[in-house]
Amino acid sequence: EVIGSQDARDPKLIEGGRIKIPIATVFFGTANNDDSTFTISDKVYDRAIWLFFDDKGYPFECPQQGPMQIPWSQMQALFDECGPKYPVSQTTIDKFGELDAFVIKKFRLAFGNRIMKQLKKFVPIYVGCGGTELDGIDFIFTNKILKKFESLNIGFLKNELKELIQMLDKLFGSDQFPMAHNFINNMLRMN
């Protein structure tokens, strides 16, 4: 809802105080998390997929590509195909449950049902696009759960963070979860 009531002078695309947004519309926005912003609320992290640019980008050359139009129905069909084709394994879900219990016990942060639902939708699509199940889980864990750690007093949680790295290694292997390892190690270095 844009405005609470209708007016004859409203722009033509506003009907009854509302703008109709097509289903295939994706919102891209920015949220600065710098010295002027203390933290971004959990609600925002929970409801969005975040892309963090932690490294400097470098220009590169590539051939010009023409536009490709894909109707939303086709995109949704491709997404829907991935669920049964690449479901998150029960073993991984069980391990993620253990990780959740560990994070609750050590940091008093819970993942919540919304994040589990997103994980079960996102990871099959991630795998369908050529990624691996564990890299998809790493992305969700780092960007949905570990980002919440920024609001904690890390100086008092260094031992717990080291234990978290050990737990990740125990559950998934020391060669997995590179994003999470980098994030945790950066927190340890900076505090």
Whereabouts are the PLM-identified features?
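C-terminal regulatory/interaction module of P-loop NTP-utilizing enzymes
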Residues: E1-N191
